Amino acid sequence: MKHNYKKYLLWLLLFLPACLMAQNKEEKMPGHITKVQKLEDVNVTGNRPHFIRLKGYYRSYQTNDSVMKYFNDGIVEYYINLKNGKTDLNAYSKRNLHNSRLVSEDKKRAFMVSDKGTFRPWPEEKTLIEQYRKKYQLKDSLGTQLVLLNQQKIGSIQTDSTRNICQIEINQLPTYKNLTHQLFGYTQTDIYDHVVEAYQISPEDYYSFKDLLFQKSDNSYLFSHKKDKQQQLIHVITELYITEKEYVEKKQSIKQDSSTPKESAAAITDFCNSNKIPALPEATEQEMQQLTPYNPANMKEIKE
């Protein structure tokens, strides 16, 4: 039995990543720069400001065995401290949705490890370009810089001088020391992890989160408890679109968001339309519309 399980797991690890990449090759490894809105140039006059404020929209959604289980999105403001690089967040018009049927089917155990993989992006510390320029070899190739690990391509850095945009794409899986993690009888095996960041080009060829335009992570993993008969294939996509940036002297606090789910949905729709945020694929949008609002503090559903 153990031999068959190991054989099955090995087959999944070998076969599924290839399937996922083949089915979504254009989306996951596009080979071209993502269509993002170029922001207006921001000039600094007078004293050096303390913060840069980035405003934008994020969405993060998860499928379990190809059925949507969680969807979270909202409008965000990041205040990046220009001295130490630390980031503070204001979030409003937040929307938290889940598939009540799938959530109700989660088995309650003495030690629960949630399968929830959605998250709110947090641009802080080092960008992908900063990390990978220091850690790995870069090689020029036909106007593109290839990112190499042990002479194998794991990503690329592309520049569009016409639009003044630079983009880095990385397949992070080859950089992992361990693909399998275990806790309280649960096992998670990573099988795909692809990230993208796009920046406005800076004159000094240095990219920090103050130049960020777009960020995306796309990852898949197998998840199960030791008592489960089979593993679930979990797929999580998280995107962040920056729509405004400005230098400011201090952070602005906002009142706690008391919007109802309907009010948040309306505000998010208006914001996305006004800022030309790319729409979800039609099938994904339809699945999202079937989900139920919930309170992330206690996971209870919100009745309107």
Features from the language model and the residues they span:
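Bacterial Sec-dependent N-terminal signal peptides
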Residues: 1-28
